[in-house]
């Protein structure tokens, strides 16, 4: 939404320009479909039938109008001319000055748009660039599961039964002799052969009379697996098999997406990556495959913010290790009471898990703060849908003295802007480290071998954790006029390897809980005097 609004601002600024400015927002086919559940078949869908006959008038209307063509506008014109809105947006994109879309249109090797590949006149603007590496890693990951095979086996016709049974035998072979849990395996030759045979049979029109949904789902899983077998440098991938009581899952995982991301970005004239969370730069350059280009081609924009805008304090005497969390709860309550009494306002509290958040909620709501008027308290619930989250946001922004507890790394702690409802502070409890896993340990081993032992732990565990921390903290300072307090609750934030991820304008102070009152009072008093001057 922020990018779309910025595009509209550009359009308004260009209103008197000599040339018409055209922008288009690409929306996923499933979300833009005007007939829910309708197959993409010209014999069945009125919006697909005769598409290219009806396209010229629809396209002409959009080009003549210019401006920003968001999902709503594209759908309105598509209905008027009875054409598919998704295909219309793609065709309009070739006439547009600016195209807004998800990463997958450029980076996903399966669904990336062929019309935009290797276009030297196109410049990439990559928003939320701290998400680029994990997103591309997920795009390069493929899997086949016994549950998909079993579902297809129960409904497939005779012409496919032999191929499905071969898949079932092959996936069982990958797990032979393995205990329940996740394991690394060296090769998947038997599964690869079974997948190839299944695809050959499925794609042979004489062998398939009726392609049931379960069979189709297995087909796409196998197609992804087959494509993944030929992707890029094998040293950056590993095979994992997870054995459960009633299922087997075989995955090909990507440990390092940087090399592929670099290949994609090099196809275009330039790439600008946007994020407030790209420190230290060498880490993100490594993740994005840009280390080899850094000396000649990379430049970093200077931050528009200054150290006087925020007071960053590390609370060094509230450890948040799992076994110490019960003892931390009353101390976190005291910290919030101190902040809200010193400066009533809106405070965001980010915690590393729902379980920890729920424990805190019971303690916080049951205590007496000692304040004349306690702040309102809202919290993010497990499994909240988008509508419920928006209602929570609306209630939070409407209040003047309020604390909202959210989960670190969730939709309410990243990529959200509170607009005119400015925050007075953000409190981040714990590091939010990813739980140990075989996949992350393999990633740590890979980067340790490639770039040194210290980088392994950093890439696999510290970077994803600190990206979430800095994103949550970034909800506070959104413009040069904003002011506020950031509290990092955990003595581990004193470590140099974690402080390397802090923005350059932060000047953190490490203090105890009993020092917070004087520290924040001094900051707000100094800020008030500076504004008066």
Language-model region placement:
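Conserved interdomain hinge at the start of the Helicase C-terminal
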Residues: 262-263, 317-352
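Conserved helicase motor "Helicase C" RecA-like lobe of SF1/SF2 P-loop NTPases
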Residues: 352-381
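Signature of the SF2 helicase/ATPase Hel1-core->accessory helical subdomain module
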Residues: 5, 81-98, 103-200, 273-290, ...
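A contiguous, basic/glycine-rich beta-loop/short-helix subdomain that forms a polymer-engagement track
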Residues: 74-96, 110-116, 204-319, 326-328, ...
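Conserved RecA-like ASCE P-loop NTPase motor core of nucleic-acid helicases/translocases
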Residues: 1, 272-274, 345-352, 356-357, ...
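Conserved RecA-like P-loop NTPase helicase motor core
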Residues: 316-327, 382-492
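N-terminal targeting/trafficking signals and adjacent low-complexity tails
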Residues: 442, 452-453, 457, 487-533
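A substrate-engagement module of RecA-like helicase motors
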Residues: 1-99, 107, 169-179, 194-208, ...
């Amino acid at each position: 939404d922020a990018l779309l609004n910025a595009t509209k601002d550009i359009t308004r600024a260009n209103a008197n320009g000599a040339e018409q400015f055209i922008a288009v927002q690409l929306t996923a086919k499933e979300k833009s479909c005007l007939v829910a559940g309708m197959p993409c078949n010209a014999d069945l869908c009125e919006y697909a039938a005769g598409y290219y006959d009806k396209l010229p008038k629809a396209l002409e209307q959009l080009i003549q109008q210019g401006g920003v063509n968001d999902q709503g506008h594209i759908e309105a014109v598509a209905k008027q001319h009875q054409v598919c809105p998704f295909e219309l947006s793609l065709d309009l994109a070739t006439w547009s000055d600016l195209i807004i879309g998800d990463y997958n249109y450029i980076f996903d090797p399966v669904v990336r748009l062929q019309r935009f590949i290797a276009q030297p006149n196109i410049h990439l603007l990559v928003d939320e660039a701290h998400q680029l590496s994990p997103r591309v890693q997920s795009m390069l990951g493929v899997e086949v599961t016994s549950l998909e095979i079993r579902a297809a086996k129960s409904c497939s016709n005779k012409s496919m039964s032999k191929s499905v049974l071969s898949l079932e035998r092959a996936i069982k072979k990958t797990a032979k002799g393995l205990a329940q849990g996740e394991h690394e395996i060296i090769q998947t030759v038997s599964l690869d052969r079974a997948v190839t045979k299944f695809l050959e049979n499925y794609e042979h029109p004489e062998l398939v009379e009726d392609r049931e949904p379960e069979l189709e789902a297995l087909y796409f899983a196998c197609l992804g697996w087959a494509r993944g077998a030929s992707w890029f440098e094998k040293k950056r991938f590993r095979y994992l098999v997870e054995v459960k009581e009633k299922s087997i899952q075989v995955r090909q995982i990507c440990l390092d997406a940087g090399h592929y991301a670099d290949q994609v970005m090099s196809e275009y004239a330039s790439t600008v990556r946007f994020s407030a969370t790209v420190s230290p730069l060498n880490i993100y350059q490594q993740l994005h495959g840009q280390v080899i280009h850094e000396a000649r081609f990379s430049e970093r924009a200077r931050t528009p913010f200054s150290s006087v805008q925020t007071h960053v304090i590390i609370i060094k005497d509230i450890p948040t290790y799992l076994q110490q969390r019960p003892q931390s709860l009353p101390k976190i309550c005291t910290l919030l009471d101190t902040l809200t009494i010193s400066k009533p306002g809106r405070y965001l509290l980010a915690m590393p898990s729902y379980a920890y958040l729920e424990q805190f909620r019971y303690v916080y709501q049951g205590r007496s703060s000692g304040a004349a008027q306690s702040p309102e308290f809202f919290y993010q619930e497990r499994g909240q849908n988008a509508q419920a989250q928006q209602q929570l946001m609306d209630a939070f922004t409407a209040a003047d003295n309020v604390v909202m507890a959210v989960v670190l790394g969730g939709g309410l702690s990243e990529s959200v802007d509170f607009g005119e409802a400015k925050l007075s502070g953000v409190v981040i409890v714990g590091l939010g480290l990813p739980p140990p896993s075989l996949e992350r340990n393999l990633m740590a081993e890979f980067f340790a071998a490639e770039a040194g032992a210290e980088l392994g732990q950093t890439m696999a565990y510290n970077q994803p954790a600190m990206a979430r921390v800095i994103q949550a903290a970034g909800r506070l300072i959104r413009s040069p006029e904003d002011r506020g307090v950031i509290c990092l609750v955990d003595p581990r934030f004193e470590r140099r390897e974690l402080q390397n991820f802090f923005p350059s304008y932060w000047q953190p102070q490490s203090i105890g809980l009993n020092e917070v009152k004087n520290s924040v009072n001094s900051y707000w008093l100094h800020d008030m005097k500076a504004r008066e001057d």
